[in-house]
């Protein structure tokens, strides 16, 4: 090999060669990044969709918003600036129109519903044998087996269990109100109730939160699980480094999940030992197993989904609703008037009668619009050949989603969107132009929430009985409770402190 010229050899040994290689590497890196930026901004199949350039070239902005629990606010701000469809990452579009719901989540014109985005529904998130992760055929089979547990008839059969847990809540709160002690944290007490209720219906026994006035460890696990889910959603955005990034997550989070799985199995096995029929969710799964529709393993795997889906989100919705009621006196007064005009005594409030309360239903609807518990939605992915969403052709392999918060707070969809106004659901002409078809808090299509009626009915019962028995006063320190709560799958709510006064016998005069 011919020797380097003397001046080059001198340059190399003086360190110039190393510096030259460093410069070459830097230039190559800048060239590669520049090529990626140019492609994603001007040549990518999604380059024609509006959105900030920083989101077009990288997933970092949306990932950072997710990590801070601010993704709902971030995406909402983009829609206010760019319109009804926004490119929020290189391969992801967010929609806020009513028409997009069916295009994304429902079967349409012979085609199946769009597949779930595997960045979001990744294999590290939930057990693959659960209804959440199942493919379309398996999902349909499991859902058919679970559906009888959530039918109107089944709910009436489950009412004694539901009423018993709510009565325990009311009795515990009444004891606190009568003691003249410390303020009551409604966030905690609603959490106790929904976890005990779901535990009772899923496992045949409550978690004992109400009885002991303390959180069961499972309550904290669910919050940890939601935060871990957010971390996994973020790291899976950065393929092919997702596995490496996931390995950097605290091992304690993985250990907590294993402990949860073990506890679930123990409780399911204990429920299976119960002799005779019991009117709860598990009984219907057992019936399906006996009929050969589900395997015993599939029965076990669905139990944890029931806890994750049915407890925390209902508690979050309840707490939002009572806060919004307590900070809007006309709403509180009208709810009390409706209760007084409908019932003579608390015992009349049941699953059938509570559904006569039209204003209460409107209050819950408006609370779900104003503060949707699952605010960021569940993304899907278009097939390789592409799909039409909201009248627009969307290229293949594009992640598409409807962000509940952004859709429900958009002036494109609702009149006075930043105001809590239950009248919008009662035919008030001020809201005739509202795009109410965009309001889908339980989603649509074959994977919509199977427990929708259970959630509505349990919230109505709890709120009606609570307002029948108590006169709550929000503490000053909780006046700004709503501001800037972070969301990791669902919202992480701080304590909601109130003083409780037991209503006297004259609070609801006997009807003529």
Swiss-Prot record:
Topological category with respect to the lipid bilayer: Single-pass membrane protein
Induction comment from the UniProt entry of this chain: Expression is regulated by the secondary metabolite regulator cclA.
GO biological process, one term: terpenoid biosynthetic process
Family membership: Belongs to the cytochrome P450 family.
Glycan-bearing residues: 191, 413
Transmembrane segments: 19-39
Lineage: Eukaryota, Fungi, Dikarya, Ascomycota, Pezizomycotina
Phenotype on disruption: Leads to the loss of intermediates such as confertifolin.
Major location category of this protein: membrane
The protein's enzyme class: oxidoreductase
Coiled-coil region(s): none
InterPro entries tied to this protein: Cyt_P450, Cyt_P450_CS, Cyt_P450_E_grp-I, Cyt_P450_sf, Cytochrome_P450_monoxygenase
Obligatory cofactor(s): heme
Pathway annotation from the record: Secondary metabolite biosynthesis; terpenoid biosynthesis
GO terms, molecular function: heme binding; iron ion binding; monooxygenase activity; oxidoreductase activity, acting on paired donors, with incorporation or reduction of molecular oxygen
Native organism: Aspergillus oryzae (strain ATCC 42149 / RIB 40)
Sequence positions that bind heme: 449
Key word Flavoprotein present: no
Protein name: Cytochrome P450 monooxygenase astD
Keyword Oxidoreductase set for record: yes
Top-level taxon: Eukaryota
